Regions:
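Asp-based, Mg2+/Mn2+-dependent phosphohydrolase catalytic module
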Residues: 1-6, 16-18, 22, 41-45, ...
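N-terminal helical cap/lid subdomain that shapes the substrate entry/recognition surface
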Residues: 2-112
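Structured helix-beta-strand junction loops
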Residues: 123-124
Length: 239
């Protein structure tokens, strides 16, 4: 069946996280600085220890449930364990999340191929974006910063709907928004366990953009593997 819709992952597909995980320590320090400025008097070492305990527990739960609680919950739970009574909607928590997000964004660059590829596909196919991120506001800011938002007919960020890839629901929601069948859609992403297994299980085609050494132990194989976004264009001509 002819492909009518092309959907993309965001991070390490359309935009690149520079330096792997190099962003995390400075982003967390920026978050902690904000908290200190707002009467949260906890040494960074203590905050760091409890934060990772909370984060790892939430990650473990998310791997099972495929839910994506907002990053705010991570911070509020950390502070509750440290003796502070903040809920996830408190302005201090939201400000701390924003501080983390702003530092993280300094480590993000646009894949130089992304604008031209999206420009070529826009109008010819329905376009969608599905991203796993617990700070959806950050994803929207990046899409604005790099002038990508207007290319897409649907944009789904996991932290907004409390579902994350590879859950069937997040892909099905995107397909419904685009008005296409799974067999008429193709997904492009860099993480085999999320961006290949997820769409393939609901009946979509999936293309892996290889940003790291090949994993030959993938349980579910991509339909194609590419190393640059521009390689997607001739593949679509044959679909």
């Amino acid at each position: 069946m002819r492909i009518k819709a092309v959907l993309f992952d965001l991070f390490d597909t359309l935009v690149i996280i520079e330096g792997g995980g190099a962003h995390y320590a400075p982003s967390l320090r920026k978050l902690h600085e904000f908290l200190r400025e707002n009467q949260v008097n906890v040494p960074f070492e203590d905050f760091h220890k409890i934060y990772f305990q909370v984060r790892d527990k939430l990650y473990s739960e998310s791997r099972e449930s495929l839910e994506e609680p907002h990053f705010n919950l991570r911070i509020s739970q950390t502070l509750q364990k440290l003796g502070y009574n903040f809920n996830a909607e408190d302005p201090v928590i939201k400000g701390a999340t924003q501080a983390f997000s702003e530092k993280f964004m300094e480590y993000i660059s646009l894949d130089p191929d992304a604008p031209q590829v999206l420009e070529r596909l826009h109008g010819k196919y329905k376009l969608g974006l599905i991203s796993n991120l617990a700070i959806p506001e950050c994803a929207w800011k990046l899409l604005e910063k790099f002038n990508l938002k207007n290319f897409f007919d649907t944009i789904i960020i996991s932290g907004e709907i409390n579902r994350r890839k590879p859950s069937a629901e997040i892909f099905q929601k995107a397909l419904k928004n685009l008005g296409v069948k799974a067999s008429e859609a193709l997904f492009v992403g860099d993480m085999p366990g999320l961006d290949i297994a997820g769409p393939k299980k609901v009946g979509m085609k999936a293309i892996l953009i290889q940003r790291r050494p090949a994993n030959n132990k993938m349980e579910i194989k991509p339909d194609k593997t590419i190393k640059r976004l521009t390689e997607l264009l001739p593949i679509l001509e044959d679909c």
